[in-house]
Amino acid sequence: MKKSLKILLTSVGCPGAPAMIRRLKNNGEREITFVGIDMNPYATGFNMVDHPYIVPPANDKDYIPSLLAVIEKEQPDVLFPQSSSEVGPISRNKQKIESLDVAVMVSKPEPIEMCNNKYNMFEFLKSNGLETPEYYFPKNLDEFQECAKLLGFPNRKVCFKPHVSKGSRGFRIIDPRIDKVDLLMNQLPFNRFIQMNEFVEMFQNIDLPQFLLMEYLEGPECTVDTLVSNGETLLATVKTREKARSGLAMIFKTLNRPDLESYSERAMKELGLDYCINVQFKGEHLIEINPRVSTFTYQDDLVLPYLSLKWLLGEITKEELAAYKSRIQYGRITIRYYEQYGVKDLHVPHIIRNK
């Protein structure tokens, strides 16, 4: 057996946390104990970790001091962040965290900031010769409507999202052909459609936020999950997003898509990212790069986050990682489902804040 590990896992209430915790614990090589943090006292992962703590949100001034307090108390071997909102603050404070003798699985601050701003990311990739969807940055309502016409509206659908957002917050599709009665009676209440007149009315008397306005892309949604070291892709897998519920992907299929992997490799090289990176495509086009872990499709003999830990700790070579490519089971279906648990008395973890 290899030396045991203590991992500090952030955002243990995120959708992918339960499966990751189970897979990392059942790695077959070593014992792993978990320190889990989240801002939500009802975070699902609190029931699965060994040492749970509530911390402030990542944008709170007390987040990093609270994180450092947990580290000083628990002395983990590795800090493994999961949320987009956390990787930036953690990366900017990486030196301070590492001074407490903990390895940090996070990219450098500059590429993280680039990826977390959708417009800046597209501008950077385009300037380095990578293909992007057609997009604009309108500064006011008039420009927004004019840019929509340049994208083919109203004959073609367009979509927009904030430059900086998390998940699908702020994303909408503008389609003049949508039927409001159909949306009301037949569609789920969290649909993403809006009409142009509704958008104009919404921002008629207030400043227009920073939106990325872009062509609406057709085709299947695919994700490349990568393990990267200073921009070099060491291992990658591709999955589809077959079905979703409440905006959350529930069914995936593992695919052999060398074209998407090739694009992802070029983007990783230009950005200089590290560790687990999630690259999203719609059809043939890039739509997003998340500088963090995503929902993985696991195999018993291929657990990407565990391999990432081994790379971080210097326990595996590039050649050994590359050999895992032959293990990928193309066509494999992964199904996510809801689980529940009950407790007689809710155990509220410790709250550590800056004093």
Region spans (language model):
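ATP-dependent carboxylate activation and anion-phosphoryl transfer catalytic cores
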Residues: 5, 11, 74, 242-247, ...
